[in-house]
Amino acid sequence: MRLPFLLLVLFWLPPAQAADIPLATVVRFNTLCATCHEGECSGRLSFDLGIQASENHIRRHAGDVDQNVWRDLARLLAHTKQACAFYPMAVDIPKGQQWNQERLTELHNATENAWFIPLGHLPAGRYRATLGMNGQTEGIAQIISAGFDITDFTLQCADRGQIAFFFLVDRSSLHYLRFKSGKGQTLRSLDIQAAD
């Protein structure tokens, strides 16, 4: 009886501040849950079947997670719907947008073999993203704006271990890279550079 009350309170709290929720949980939400829920930021919560249904929904997709993780995933869902934005991530963007494997490991959801990387505020323009992999690569990269505008890139690389693609930023804003690849593939480096 106490858990449903706690959830009801969580959904009416103001959006949480960066670092309130562990980074690993934020990455998990943004690589698994947000792929469906980022389009639902209408300012309303659509849990028509009640709190128990939302718990069942989270457990069905995220697995049998610890109660604290489950609570944080519910808070992230509420934040996405209320603020119509990704939850703030307490991550320093490396100088020159050159990410190494150590930094990328913090932004990796091993269960889904997916990464969610904040690129920071990008001015309007054309950019080149270069991904360094541990060998043959097959996956999907998405560039996502703060307003949830998403551009998909299907990536395949035979064996060189490096693949690049170009993307366009229409309006200056915060941007993110979400990348999902096959099991056993590791993102070792990421380099984002202006291409104009």
Language-model features: where?
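Noncatalytic modules at the cell exterior or secretory-pathway interfaces
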Residues: 126-128, 168-182
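Gly/Gly-Pro-rich "capping" loops immediately C-terminal to redox-active cysteine motifs
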Residues: 22-26, 38-63
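Beta-sandwich interaction modules
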Residues: 119-120, 147-172
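Short, surface-exposed beta-strand/strand-loop-strand elements in extracellular ectodomains
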Residues: 138-149
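C-terminal capping alpha-helices of c-type cytochrome domains
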Residues: 62-91
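The canonical Cys-X-X-Cys-His
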Residues: 29-40, 73
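Solvent-exposed, flexible loop/coil segments flanking beta-strands in beta-rich domains
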Residues: 82-127
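Exposed low-complexity, polar/acidic, P/S/T/G-rich flexible segments that act as propeptides
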Residues: 182-196
